């Protein structure tokens, strides 16, 4: 292949990546992306009202670098900690927020997105959203999507240690686990409230590894 052919191949490769919403990667990294369990997978990422919401930016970046298509869903509480624009820019996808403003299609947006998802990840997951999922409540886009989704669900809790240890939260987590919901964390360390304890969001690298594990067996 001559120089002109190589350049043409590279241009076509970049166009293919852009068309599929992937982060452009060097040619030597293309094979690694395509061999990733995340390549071409659709991941819905729920971001809820925890100080750890800012870590969703890093999570999106890492998932997209491995070839995943990430669709952020931001709750009202989550929007207090990170902006929709940040998530949209990193994911290159619109950010779902309002259950009552889902676009012009005939099918409700949360239903369409749930039907297409390979995995629903909630990171960070607050005590509130864990309770909503456990009791089948559907007050917003994320909780409604959860009731429709038939894909695997992974939750990464982040909250005050006393909230995590409360009998209600413990019972809600146990309920969800019996339904097949996967959990990762929380981690132990200094919390935003000033206490040492269990409640920190699990490291992003660890969440990505867990996602790879879940999607690698589908």
Describe the role of every protein-language-model region.
Residues 3-5:
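Intrinsic, low-complexity polybasic segments
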Residues 22, 27-154, 161-218:
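A cross-family phosphate/adenosyl-ligand binding-site feature
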């Amino acid at each position: 292949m001559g120089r002109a052919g190589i350049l043409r191949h590279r241009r076509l490769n970049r166009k293919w990546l852009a068309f599929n919403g992937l982060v452009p990667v060097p040619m030597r990294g293309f094979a690694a992306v395509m061999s990733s369990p995340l390549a071409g997978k659709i991941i819905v990422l729920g971001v809820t009202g925890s100080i750890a919401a800012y870590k969703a930016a890093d999570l999106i970046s890492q998932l997209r670098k491995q070839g995943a298509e990430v669709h952020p869903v931001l709750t009202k509480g989550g929007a207090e900690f990170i902006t929709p624009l940040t998530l949209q820019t990193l994911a290159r996808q619109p950010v779902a927020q309002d259950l009552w403003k889902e676009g012009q299609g005939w099918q409700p947006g949360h239903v369409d997105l749930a039907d297409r998802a390979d995995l629903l990840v909630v990171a960070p997951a607050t005590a509130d959203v864990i309770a909503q999922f456990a009791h089948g409540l559907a007050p917003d886009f994320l909780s409604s999507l959860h009731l429709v989704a038939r894909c695997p669900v992974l939750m990464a809790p982040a909250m005050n240690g006393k909230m995590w240890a409360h009998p209600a939260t413990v019972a809600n987590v146990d309920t969800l686990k019996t339904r097949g919901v996967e959990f990762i964390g929380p981690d132990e360390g200094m919390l935003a409230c000033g206490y040492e304890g269990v409640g920190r969001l699990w490291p992003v690298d660890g969440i990505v590894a867990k996602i790879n594990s879940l999607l690698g067996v589908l």
